Every structure is written in C-alpha cells, then in structure tokens.
C-alpha cells in the first residue's frame, strides 16, 4: 500500500518507467485492515479481533479483580499480619499467591507454588483462592484457543490471496532493487 501511495503521490509528478511496476501492485484493504486491527505486535492480539476474545478478556479482568479482592482481605487482616513476609498479592505459576514466612507456612491453609531462593518465603495460594484461580486458568485457556482460532482464520484469508500477495511481493522486490541501485549510484556520484 505504501508503494502504491508513493506512486500516486510523490512519485506521480511525471511519467516514469517505474509506473509499469506500480500499476501491477494491488491492495486488499479489507485483508490489510483485518490484520492490522487484529494483530498489535508479534506478541499481542487486539481485544477487537473478535467479540469472543473481548468477552473472554473482560472476564479475565473481572476474575483477577475478584481474586485480588479476596486475597487483599487476607493480607490486610491482623490475624495474618505476623505470618506474611510482605502484605502483597503476587503471581507464581500463573496463580495469585501471598508471600508467607517459611517458619509460618503451616498457618495459612493453601497450596505452595514457589519458594524464594533464600528459602525464607513460601508463596502460598490460600484455599479460599483455589476455585477462583482455577476459573482464571480456564479463562486463559479459552483466550489461547480463541487467539489460535483468530490467527488460523487470518491465515486462511491470507492464503486465499496468496497468488496476488506473491505477485505484489515480487514487484516490490524488483522495485527495492531498482531503488537500491539508484541510491548506490547517487552515493557514488555515478549518475
């Protein structure tokens, strides 16, 4: 699209032998917008990629907040103040946990997910958070599945246009070589 825009804008001032190349380039605005609106980076898919993904991510945020709120009650409770290493909620092995002093680990019923390198802190998922964390894990699995579905759909749509994409690629490659030779000639003052 950028090459086509160049040909129609800055490059369109006068006829050129390159016009034949630019005329061969086609753009598929629908596919382009679909990809750019779905893929934010190599690691991130937009919520707007599908209504299902947006819904799942909304549920993830709600469930995370619910678990944090539940654990917040524990870390602010005076009855647990002496056993906590710090009054914070953290994440270990994709589970919300609280840091408990090693010598007090048996005083908070729950599952141990990690131990600090010094061995002085146990990261425990209180039993009251297990069901919530399980629901959160299921939501993360649903999110991964939906992302895979979206990427498969985009791949299939791209595959439907593979011949034109290949032709455009070949033309753009040729144009890149022409411009590279021109830049080199200009840099060497070999014009």
Q: What are the functions of these language-model segments?
A:
Residues 1-22:
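Long, charged all-alpha helical bundle/coiled-coil segments in cytosolic proteins
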Residues 22-33:
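Extended, EK/Q-rich alpha-helical coiled-coil segments that serve as long dimerization/scaffolding arms
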Residues 12, 16, 32-191:
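Alpha-helical coupling/stalk and coiled-coil linker elements that connect catalytic or binding modules
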């Amino acid at each position: 699209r950028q090459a086509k825009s160049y040909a129609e804008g800055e490059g369109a001032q006068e006829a050129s032998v390159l016009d034949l190349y630019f005329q061969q380039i086609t753009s598929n605005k629908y596919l382009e917008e679909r990809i750019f609106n779905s893929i934010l980076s190599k690691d991130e898919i937009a919520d707007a990629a599908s209504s299902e993904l947006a819904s799942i991510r909304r549920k993830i945020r709600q469930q995370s907040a619910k678990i944090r709120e539940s654990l917040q009650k524990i870390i602010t409770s005076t009855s647990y103040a002496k056993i906590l290493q710090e009054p914070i909620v953290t994440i270990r092995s994709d589970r919300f946990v609280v840091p408990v002093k090693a010598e007090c680990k048996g005083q908070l019923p729950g599952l141990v997910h990690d131990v600090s390198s010094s061995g002085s802190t146990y990261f425990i998922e209180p039993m009251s958070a297990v069901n919530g964390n399980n629901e959160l894990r299921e939501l993360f699995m649903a999110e991964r599945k939906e992302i895979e579905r979206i990427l498969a759909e985009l791949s299939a749509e791209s595959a439907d246009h593979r011949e034109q994409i290949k032709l455009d690629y070949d033309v753009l490659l040729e144009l890149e070589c022409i411009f590279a030779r021109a830049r080199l000639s200009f840099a060497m003052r070999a014009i």
